[in-house]
Amino acid sequence: MAQEIEKEFLVKGDFKSEAFKATRITQGYLSSVPERTVRVRVKGDKGFITIKGIGNASGAARFEWEKEIPVEEVQQLLELAEPGVIDKTRYLVKNTDGKHTWEVDEFYGDNDGLTVAEVELADESEPFDKPEWLGEEVTGDPKYFNSMLMKNPYKNWK
C-alpha cells in the first residue's frame, strides 16, 4: 500500500489554457467513514476501486490502495453506493517547475461552481511553484473531501 502526499488548493483563476489533458470522472462511495473510504470510479473509459486510510495530522498524507476493475463492475457497485455521486472533469496542468503536475477538478451537479487543484509530493516539505490561478490552501479540510462533497455538496454551503 502506498502513501499519498498531496496539497490541495481552491482555484481562483483561469487554468484551462494550460491544461494538456481532460478526463471525465464519475464516482461514488461504498464507505465514507473518516477512518477509511472505499470509492468506485469511472475515469474516462476505465474503472477503479480505491481504499484510502485516515489522513495524518496535517491532512496531507494518507495510505491509498487502488486497483483497476471493469467499468461494468463499477456501474454495478455504484448501485450499492451511498447516496450521491460525484461528477467532475479532471484537468492535468504541468507545473512551471517542470517536476510536478497539477490535477484540477471542476465539479458539476450539486457541486457546480467548485474547482480545486492538488499536487502530489514526495514529502510534505517538498517545495513546488504555485501558479497564479491558485487560491486558498484547503489541504486537510474535510468539507473539500470528495466523500464529504457527496454528503454536503457545495450548493448547500451558500
Question: Where do the protein language model's features map onto the residues?
Answer:
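Phosphate-end processing signature that detects enzymes handling 5′-triphosphorylated RNA
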Residues: M1-K158
